[in-house]
Amino acid sequence: MIDLSTMKQQIETLLNQAIERLKTKGVLKPEVTPVIKITHTTDPQHGDFATNLALTLSKAAGMRPHALAEKIVEALPPSGQITEVEIAGPGFINFFVTEGSYQTVVSSILKAGKDYGRSEMGKGQRVHMEYVSANPTGPLHVGHGRGAAYGACVANLLNAAGFEVHREYYVNDAGRQMGILALSVWVRYLQGYEASIELPKNAYQGEYIIDIAEALKAKYGKQFYHSVESIQAKIPEEIDSNADPEAYLDAWVTAQKDLLGPKDFECVFQAALDSILNDIKNDLEEFGVTYDDWFPESRLVREGLIQEGLDLLTKHGYVYEKNGAQWFRATALGDEKDRVLIRKNGLPTYFAADVAYHLHKFNQGYDQIIDIFGADHHGYIPRIRGFLKGLGKAPEKLHILLVQFAILYRGNEKVSMSTRGGTFVTLRELRHEVGNDAARFFYIMRKPDQHLDFDLELAKSQSNENPVYYIQYAHARICSVFRQLKTTQKNWDRPRGMENLSLLSTNYEKELLATLGRYPEVIKRAAMNYAPHLLAHYLQTLANQFHTYYNAERFLIEDDNLRNARLNLINAVQQIIRNGLTLLGVSAPEEM
């Protein structure tokens, strides 16, 4: 059995043997250690694989790259799978492999089925992934959708490469925004009893807040009702709602807690949290994004993790007191300024929670820890790496991946989003409009750090310009061929087809075979680089090659040997498209 990555390894072995021969002959010094890089050529006229080894070793050898390339080629051992080796340009070495090497990829694919392309590259390595982790203060919007699709795809790719992946969502259930959420629900609840009271302008304004308030009213009646006068009496007169709206909002939250008391406040708070978090969970599950754990921030306090982090930073000399607060000496570890850990009122900051949460991740013994953040969190990178050093943890284990938010266009008009303002397009609305498949694919078809203009009309179109439709249509077309086969007197003899793969000699077939052989390498590269867009682009290429082949050749022909060989080939294409789409969280329909 062969795949492209296996062929690369074989060529690398041949080159290493050639280098050892050149060392024996004195052409290269014994201490020379080559770094061999083998790439797939883009032009078949230049062979199937190429290496720049002669260019990288020319200085150590003391000769021109082309002359060294000649020496390397002369020293190469013979191989039954390589038909020709040529030198191109200043010293590139091109390898041409036998057609039989590519034809055997069909049998490899059909034998492995849904497992083709999977590897044990990451066997024994555990990876912790955190992604989305949007505050449970409202429904997910289209910006969150990109992080969800990207994170889920990266997790799938790492799993396919043999890594054991733990998927986690961090639930911010203990921050200031949650207090504002509880306040927003409570004010809407009071308005439901016709209280003459206005929702503070910086509170959460969406219709979903009213829905939660109505459910609260239906279940608890007037249990949480207080007069407008009693509320206003709790708001300090010196706070101007226009001059300092955030301070005014905080005063409201304090008033709510005082009036309701701990038990009733917790009841309102929990009703809001449960409603929104359940909605987020359902939304993501419908989107095909699932988690192994939903980790609440409140657990950090409950299990003493914040104190554990604080103690460790203190032990290492990175904590000091100023103005009644406890500070992290972040500037000593590369950050632009020191950070408050514990406020003077004794409450931990968001930063302290970040420290505790990452300490918890590292304490679990993962080999890799991946945080996927929105691009607006780029400033977090130096501070996170800084406190990891302060904790005595290895920052190189942490990989922070930034995802640009998707920008949604309806026609030529850009849609703005604001969670507190309530005017935003939700992920659910997007999914219902364009479908899960289009949303999942469009979100990951560009590099995550590139801006994504999400074209609604293109995502809904059934045309060749819509990449996900084009790929799915290739799969459906192949299914159609096999349905047509059942209506004829012809049969499909898979073993006979395997015996006649050498008949696949057209340029279309050679191109498809070469592309099929690249699939395992694409999965490995996409996994190691956290780059699902590489798989998306590969599937577009494969689909395009198949459509060209479909339009040029016939499959249900009279020639039994060629028919069976071609049916095996397109069955392999069908399997790879299905495997690839599955990793991207996209369906492979049999009819369209």
Swiss-Prot record:
Monomer. SMART domains: Arg_tRNA_synt_N, DALR_1. GO terms for biological process: arginyl-tRNA aminoacylation. CDD domains: Anticodon_Ia_Arg, ArgRS_core. It comes from Coxiella burnetii (strain Dugway 5J108-111). Transmembrane segments: none annotated. This is Arginine--tRNA ligase. It catalyses: tRNA(Arg) + L-arginine + ATP = L-arginyl-tRNA(Arg) + AMP + diphosphate. Belongs to the class-I aminoacyl-tRNA synthetase family. The keyword Nucleotide-binding applies. It holds the Pfam family tRNA-synt_1d. InterPro entries: aa-tRNA-synth_I_CS, Arg-tRNA-ligase, Arg-tRNA-synth_N, Arg-tRNA-synth_N_sf, ArgRS_core, DALR_anticod-bd, Rossmann-like_a/b/a_fold, tRNAsynth_Ia_anticodon-bd. It comes from the Bacteria. It is found in: Cytoplasm. One of its GO terms (molecular function) is arginine-tRNA ligase activity. NCBIfam families: argS. Its EC number is 6.1.1.19. GO terms for cellular component: cytoplasm. Keywords: Aminoacyl-tRNA synthetase, ATP-binding, Cytoplasm, Ligase, Nucleotide-binding, Protein biosynthesis. Its main location: cytoplasm. A motif ('HIGH' region) lies at residues 134-144.
